Amino acid sequence: MARKRASEPTTITTKEAIVTSDKETKPPPLPPHRQTSNDQPIAPPKKGFIFKLSLLLIAPYFYLLLFHYQIQHDLIKPILINAGLSLAGFFLTVKLIPVASKYVLKRNLFGYDINKKGTPQGTVKVPESLGIVVAAVFMVLTIVFQFLNFAPDSNWLVEYNAALASICFMTLLGFIDDVLDVPWRVKLLLPSIAALPLLMAYAGHTTIIIPKPLVPYIGLKVLDLGFIYKIYMWFLAIFCTNCINIHAGINGLEAGQTVVIASAILIHNVMQIGASADPEYQQAHAFSVYLVQPLLATSLALLSYNWYPSSVFVGDTYTYFAGMTMAVVGILGHFSETLLIFFLAQVLNFLLSVPQLFGFRHCPRHRLPRFDPQTGLLTGTNDGTLVNFYLRMFGRKTENSLCMHLLLVQGLLASSRVWTSLSHASHNFGTRERRWPQAGVPGFLIMAPD
């Protein structure tokens, strides 16, 4: 899997000598460019960029929530409380990342930016695995919100705790992967284990509505998939957790795609809440909002350090955490198939990666573009990733420009689904209550025209 690190072997820094060939010798000195102090501060967050990005992505969501739809006060109040906690989590994450960077450097968890090799920036130790800060703040926010919002006898409490258990489990496994650097085949097993609490707690329906053009051929209007639907959700959790990890390789891409998808999920949820009169249907989408707002806020804080040029790397800890969180909200919010549409860029990247991931072609450790230090441009290689495919199709680009292009593509794919949802939601306003019993139906099937 493509990852932006080339960590050096752990160096023993104790006062004891290293024994080699029965002779005691001192550890060789590091080259001058590697003698970086662990106390050296990282670059400050890119606050201006994050502020502009936040306005672009979050303003439509709050406009729909507060002005466009007439949403009940009892439903808006917990969403705004959650938003306030998320805002506090943003500033807390911004403050904690520089502190955590010093500790991970002391433990030799760092990497070199391969896409800057041959330049002074390519010799700087970049702290790795800073996704652990995002995950820790996220867990604190969601637990505090649980105390403020859910009663002890709430029907949603079991699923909420199961969601937090799966997310926490996946964060732990991701950090283990960062430390041990496990083979990619093992990576497929990690989310399958972490998803078990989620699947065991799922109490939603497993039926889908058959599109009318297919009803004469199938003979059914509603099909109950039963246990097969849970298998689908299990594979969805595995895919979402790994797809962000393999759609990577340039500064800001991992955190950036999470921010774009999370924003699309929020807009989708508020449109479904506003277009429905069914309280249970509204609560399912509000449940999703409660988890996505903290994810978006903490990811924006991480992106302020991870945007080009990155002063920290997110690590597998973050990609696993973010992927599992979005899988959880899609499954328990009952729009798991719609979620897959938001991941269309990741689906394309996975399809391009299949020959290498499954051993049909040679798969190098880092499937990154080729960097030219003279021009500062990236050239696409023959590796099967969307990053390289985009460069081969549209020519060489700088790393910053390439990331912006890829996130724009991600946003366009997600917004197309959002606008489709908006038009259908307006058409079907007031009919959601009769559609709700098929809670697990795909978004593109439930909105089939009558």
Label every model-predicted segment.
Residues 180-183:
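Flexible hinge motifs at transmembrane-helix junctions and intramembrane kinks/re-entrant loops
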Residues 209-222:
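Fold-level signal for large, globular catalytic cores of enzyme and receptor domains
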Residues 2-103, 134-172, 213, 228-243, ...:
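Alpha-helical transmembrane segments
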Residues 114-129:
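Juxtamembrane helix-capping/reentrant segments at transmembrane boundaries
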Residues 98-112, 203-210:
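Juxtamembrane interfacial secondary-structure elements that flank transmembrane helices
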Residues 189-200:
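Carboxylate/His-rich catalytic cores and anion/metal-binding grooves
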